[in-house]
Amino acid sequence: MAKAKINDFTKKEIQLSEIAKALAHPARVRILNILFENNVCITGDIVDQLPLSQSTVSQHLIELKKVGLIKGEIEGLKTCYCLNNKIVESTKTLLNNLFSKICNC
């Protein structure tokens, strides 16, 4: 998105589009499901549940963390990840509002 045009969109529109972009890969959706099911996970546990290399999983975790959907806390040599419930809830609200307007349901 061109920087000059970014001011033409609301903060919520920009936030939702960035989150949607982060969710636009099935591995990232799976990572969110893994974190939901396990509450917290270290990177190695997530890697064990995906058909991807550790470096690829790490890149997906970075993208999810960048938009705030997950939090990562360093514990010694490991990083422990969990869902950022505040952002997950606000994303749910943004999506519900958007689809309620679109389909008028």
What are these regions (language model features)?
Residues 50-53, 63, 101:
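Juxtamembrane/interface motifs at transmembrane-helix termini
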Residues 14-55, 77-87:
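N-terminal helix-turn-helix DNA-binding core of bacterial DNA-binding proteins
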Residues 1-16, 36-37, 85-105:
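Amphipathic alpha-helical dimerization/coiled-coil segments
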